[in-house]
Amino acid sequence: MLNAIIVDDEEFARSSLYFLLQENCENIHISGIAKSVSEARNLLAHNAIDLIFLDIAMPGENGFDLIPQIQSTKTHVIFTTAYDQYALKAIKANALDYLLKPIDIDELKEA
């Protein structure tokens, strides 16, 4: 079982992804949900997290700002974004994968 967190500033995106994961990915346990990078840092500091579903474009710090903290761990990142121009940057940041919003269930299962 993988312990995962969802990080996204949009309530609808967070709840939609949570629902998709709960209904379709029985090997993933959602250990927390954050609406900002600072909340994600707090979750990472207090939980053993295997996987992060991380939005890129958020107010304040963006998803890429969290990467330096994650790189020193074995935590994998799947970026979620509505902007396909971030795909190359996500790959260069050693993301496990990236998903374009709205998230397609088949793409989620492949990631």
Regions found by a protein language model. Give the residues of each.
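Conserved Asp/Asn-Gly motif in the active-site loop of CheY-like receiver
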Residues: 31-40
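CheY-like receiver
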Residues: 41-111
